[in-house]
């Protein structure tokens, strides 16, 4: 299905649309809108290769989308947006769309997938700045509540995402919300071979 409500009028952010990174079509089932002003933002890492160029990032994202749709049976790539090592923001499900990223919170949050494994290091400054600017844009357009709290997936699910080192960094941020009351534990989905 076509993705609507796309707004890339965020000052200073280098957006890469689904068309630009070569996305497959979303499956139409259960592709619902989230509410305006979601109260939670989740940072994830893709737990795989990093990328430093648009072509390399696009290639990695296409592989993740195929895994999420074909191996895991999801409607689309899990994340609302992905952030590459080049500092660009890649459109996943986009604004105001339910993701498949954080059990129990998919319909009341947005997710940013940082491309790479951040268990032993923090994403680079360009990536962190892009995420900060994306949140501010989301607030300005009404997609994210001005009173949002920021979390890693491990604050809501039994996962190590977004990696130990990145998570320690997140805990120092002003809007960090910590472990959430509704905490969901399930077996992790099957691995993606990216």
Region roles according to the model:
Residues 35-69:
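Active-site acidic/histidine clusters and adjacent loop/turn architecture
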